[in-house]
UniProtKB/Swiss-Prot annotation:
Binding site for ATP: Q87, G105, E106, G107, K108, T109, D499
Subunit structure: Monomer and homodimer. Part of the essential Sec protein translocation apparatus which comprises SecA, SecYEG and auxiliary proteins SecDF-YajC and YidC.
Gene Ontology biological-process entries: intracellular protein transmembrane transport; protein import; protein targeting; protein transport by the Sec complex
Topology within the bilayer: Peripheral membrane protein
UniProt KW keywords: ATP-binding, Cell inner membrane, Cell membrane, Cytoplasm, Membrane, Metal-binding, Nucleotide-binding, Protein transport, Translocase, Translocation, Transport, Zinc
One Gene Ontology cellular component annotation held by this UniProt entry: cytosol
PROSITE patterns in the cross-refs: SECA, SECA_MOTOR_DEAD
Protein name: Protein translocase subunit SecA
Name of the gene encoding the protein in the UniProt record: secA
Enzyme Commission number(s) from the entry: 7.4.2.8
Family recorded in the similarity comment: Belongs to the SecA family.
Species this chain originates from: Rhizorhabdus wittichii (strain DSM 6014 / CCUG 31198 / JCM 15750 / NBRC 105917 / EY 4224 / RW1)
Described purpose of this protein according to its UniProt entry: Part of the Sec protein translocase complex. Interacts with the SecYEG preprotein conducting channel. Has a central role in coupling the hydrolysis of ATP to the transfer of proteins into and across the cell membrane, serving both as a receptor for the preprotein-SecB complex and as an ATP-driven molecular motor driving the stepwise translocation of polypeptide chains across the membrane.
CDD domains cross-referenced by the UniProt entry: DEXDc_SecA, SF2_C_secA
Matches recorded under SMART domains: SecA_DEAD (SM00957), SecA_PP_bind (SM00958)
Length: 912
């Protein structure tokens, strides 16, 4: 109570902060008369003057008032739109690296031009991040007119661009693109073998549109680039056929966690079925020999029980397409990882694509935290303000609306079941349609949208459906959803992006009614003027009918998604209405709600078709949503805690790669590696302060031959007086150095340096890939340490550090071994041409994976890529190389073959 009283008297901290920005608005307004008097050339020349002032030592903050006034005047001339004062406040907030919460229709796209222009003046590049390719392309063209007028260059990153086109786009002053494109380009760059092939610029400043979607909703889904592994499609099909024979009594399904666990009876049934199929070994499902089968079984259970068609995914063109749970959009090209996608493919009977192994990964949290300054915009951020500050150190500032909000948000209506709810929804839609009020109906899934569509069709209510199946028509359907009497059923995808304009959209009506007319012709202008008049008249009729009616068919897990849906109505001071219709069948209430209390209310004197409207119910639902939000926040927080461990290691590896690529020669690094390896070999076989009789000479000979490529007279050396491990190590290193010196004498220095650099980069990448897989496996089981009264995250940090140290040792040994065994079978000058990058590299997003379909990249990942690097770092040694059982025992299946071929052992002398 006291807090509310203080806020009423003094205003909230947000109000005081916004008020503190008013003096800057006055300074901006002071420049307007001068700028308005300039001609176009003089106004455009402001950019050159600003850059000169920056070079002279002025700061961006000191330039802000005049720069913002310049953008406002340029937008007025080029777009016919003048920034409102509240939009100027939004621009200041973005420039300061904070989040501007602005309601739908307040012009966030135009707001971004202010901070983007100002921060592009130093010439270090500004990234504008959008949620889809359509918005990136649209905004780059639309707002690009303002930037180009002022002399700045604009690029856009979309799929299927070549590396050169991407470099050009990143080289522009301002670059538009999606969060996925920016993130994947960063990962791909750190898999290249030559600086010149990279596309990404150093991080400077980014503005993230729909910042809550990018930094919160997608924060649980790391970006992953991966390559294929062995084909196991037959096993997926066999296990799926077995899982389809289990009944509900055979497993327990936790909808909250999306986990499926076999009961004791279910385990016995599965064991019998697996044994009959010849897939069970050891007579026990959980025997060590069945580890792989158990993994496939768990994923098949999840695919068949926890993942629903037309809710979590759709089947299109014989492919499984994931549906984004927050936006309702198709995530074309992305795949679930860890075999889940393959299990769903087996479930639906479509072609099973091979599994993939992680080559590189990063979370959005750690990607965007690399920007020295980051700003964001959205219509819904206040509910997540704590998370934005905790993880990104960004404050949320609520920007006042330009005009008061007139939308009426009515209380929820609560029904016994879905049938009663749909009947009430149909009646409400019919009544709104009769009075000419447009209706936007929000659903939580494709399945629900199509179910409601069938219901309305039977009731002869004309409508349009917008979901992931018809995403190509998204902008068109949403833009016309505000026409007189229009009824649009949409999933969450209608919550962002294109504005719903009451009366209709001029651009889309022109495309519909006059597609053949050319812009600028008298016929086009006449048609546009006629339609513009019709839209104005229709808008008046819609306003008289009450504006846009937003009707929610159930509550989403997140309050933000509900608020986004409400926010489609009442833009720029227009009237509007919003109401949610709920039932006990709704997923949120069924899974997270207080079922007993709801059921008691439903059964108490409530007739069929009758609704309850109660603030208590709305409060209970909000409590359920807060519980889900808190759980999801904990998940995201945990993701970033664990990824921070990997991120520290990622930075080291990527910095090492950059240093290697920038260095003219890595001779010193390779020499140190050889010395460390020689010392490690001798130290492992000849402990300090021990006698020669105690040394493991056989292993010393074996490892020296395998790793260093030498066969010195160890027996003679050991017989010498005064020999000790230190002296022995010096002798071994001298022999190893002599082997390398002999190889170097056969080719020129430039070729040798290229070979060293290539071997080092390739080995680094190979072991980093294996390390990522190991960390992922560790991450899956580390929670079990809690049973031993240990903190999992601390245990993970400790184990990950130890694994990282072991990886560095393995890199040193493998680089030394490959260079010791490298052989040349053709003239060095014949190595000039480089192989193309393998085109099997695909991209994943976490449990979500996204494919790169560009196909024509210049960059490399698994080949040897570099402008002066030999094509083959090692020529095959032929069949005369013998792998003894002793050598084989020291090799992993993914180790490089010691014969010097440069191929993996399992594909060379270790092939079965």
């Amino acid at each position: 109570m006291l807090g509310g009283l203080a806020k009423a008297i003094f205003g909230s901290s947000n109000d005081r902060y916004v008020k503190s920005l008013r003096p800057i608005l006055q300074k901006i307004a002071g420049f307007e008369p001068t700028l308005e008097a300039m001609n176009d050339e003089e106004l455009a020349a402001q950019t050159v003057k600003f850059r000169q002032r920056l070079d002279a030592g002025e700061t961006l903050d000191s330039l802000l008032p005049e720069a913002f006034a310049t953008v406002r005047e340029a937008a007025r001339r080029v777009l016919g739109q003048r920034h409102y004062d509240v939009q100027m406040i939004g621009g200041i907030v973005l420039h300061r690296g904070e989040i501007a919460e602005m309601r739908t229709g307040e012009g966030k796209t135009l707001v971004a031009t202010l901070a983007v222009y100002l921060n592009a003046l130093p010439g270090e590049g500004v990234h504008v991040v959008t949620v889809n390719d359509y918005l990136a392309t649209r905004d780059a063209e639309w707002m690009g007119r303002v930037y180009r007028f002022l002399g700045l260059t604009v690029g856009v990153i979309v799929p299927n661009l070549s590396d050169q086109e991407r470099r050009d786009a990143y080289g522009a002053d301002i670059t538009y693109g999606t969060n996925n494109e920016f993130g994947f380009d960063y990962l791909r760059d750190n898999m290249k073998y030559d600086r010149a092939l990279m596309v990404h610029r150093p991080f400077n400043f980014a503005v993230v549109d729909e910042v809550d979607s990018v930094l919160i909703d997608e924060a649980r889904t790391p970006l992953i680039i991966s390559g294929p592994t062995d084909d196991k499609s037959e096993l997926y099909m066999q296990v799926d056929a077995i899982v389809k024979q289990v009944t509900k009594d055979d497993y327990e399904f936790d909808e909250k966690q999306r986990s499926v666990v076999l009961t004791e009876d279910g385990t016995e049934r599965i064991e019998r079925l697996l044994e009959a199929a010849g897939l069970l070994e050891g007579g026990n499902l959980y025997a060590y020999e069945n580890t792989q089968v158990v993994h496939h079984l768990n994923q098949a259970l999840r695919a068949n029980v926890a993942f629903k068609r037309d809710t979590d995914y759709i089947v299109k063109d014989e492919k499984i397409i994931i549906i984004d749970e927050f936006t309702g959009r198709m995530m074309d090209g992305r795949r679930w990882s860890d075999g889940l996608h393959q299990a769903v493919e087996a479930k639906e009977g479509v072609k099973i694509e091979p599994e993939n192994q992680t080559l590189a990964s990063i979370t959005f949290q750690n990607y965007f935290r690399m920007y020295p300054k980051l700003g964001g915009m959205t219509g819904t951020a206040a509910t997540e303000a704590h998370e934005f500050y905790q993880i990104y150190k960004m404050n949320v500032v609520t920007i006042p609306t330009n005009l008061p909000v007139k939308r009426i948000d009515q209380d929820d209506e609560f029904y016994k079941n879905m049938l009663d709810k749909f009947a009430a929804i149909t009646q409400a839609i019919r009544e709104a349609k009769e009075r000419g009020q447009p209706v936007l109906v929000g659903t939580v899934s494709i399945e629900k949208s199509e179910l409601l569509s069938e219901f309305l069709t039977k009731e002869k209510v004309e409508h349009k459906v917008l979901n992931a199946r018809y995403h190509e028509q998204e902008a068109h359907i949403v833009a016309q959803a505000g026409r007189l009497g229009a009824v649009t059923i949409a999933t969450n995808m209608a919550g962002r992006g294109t504005d719903i304009q009451l009366g209709g959209n001029l651009e889309f009506r022109m495309l519909d009614e006059h597609p053949a007319l050319e812009i600028g012709t008298p016929e086009f202008d006449a048609a546009a003027e006629r339609i513009r008049g019709e839209i104005i008249a229709e808008k008046e009729a819609v306003l008289a009918a009450g504006g846009l009616f937003v009707l929610g068919t159930e509550r989403h897990e997140s309050r933000r998604i509900d608020n986004q849906l409400r926010g489609r109505s009442g833009r720029q001071g227009d009237p509007g209405l919003s109401r949610f219709y709920l039932s006990l069948d709704d997923d949120l209430l069924r899974i997270f709600g207080p079922q007993t209390m709801f059921a008691r209310m439903m059964n108490k004197n409530l007739a069929d078709g009758e609704a309850i409207v109660s603030p208590w119910i709305s409060k209970a639902i909000e409590t359920a949503q807060k519980k889900v939000e808190a759980r999801n926040y904990d998940i995201r927080k945990q993701v970033v805690e664990y990824d921070d461990v990997m991120n520290d290691q990622r930075k080291v590896i990527y910095e090492q790669r950059a240093d290697i690529m920038d260095a003219e020669t890595v001779d010193d690094v390779v020499t140190d590696m050889r010395a460390d390896t020689a010392n490690a070999i001798v130290g492992g076989c000849c402990p300090p302060h021990s006698y020669p009789e105690q040394w493991d000479v056989d292993t010393l000979k074996l490892r020296s031959a395998e790793t260093l490529g030498i066969t010195p007279p160890f027996d003679e050396w050991i017989e010498q007086d005064g020999i000790d491990p230190e002296i022995l190590a010096e002798k071994v290193l001298a022999e190893a150095d002599a082997v390398i010196a002999a190889k170097r004498a056969t080719i020129d220095d430039q070729s040798w340096h290229g070979i060293e650099k290539s071997v080092l980069l390739q080995t680094l990448d190979h072991h980093w890939k294996e390390h990522l897989a190991t960390l992922d496996a560790l991450r899956q089981v580390i929670h079990l340490r809690a049973y031993a009264q240990k903190t999992p995250i601390n245990e993970y940090k400790h184990e990950a550090f130890a694994l990282f140290e072991r990886m560095l040792v393995a890199i040193r040994e493998e680089v030394t071994r490959v260079l010791a065994h490298v052989r040349f079978e053709m003239a060095p000058q014949d190595y000039a041409e480089l192989p193309p990058m393998p085109d099997f590299v695909t991209e994943h997003v976490n449990a979500l994976t996204g494919e790169d379909n560009s196909g024509d990249r210049d960059g490399g990942t698994l080949g040897i890529i570099g402008s002066r690097v030999p094509q083959a770092i090692a020529a095959p040694a032929g069949d005369d190389f013998e792998i003894t059982p002793e050598i084989a025992a020291t090799l992993g299946r993914n180790s490089l073959c010691p014969c010097g071929s440069g191929r993996k052992y399992k594909h060379c002398h270790g092939a079965l």
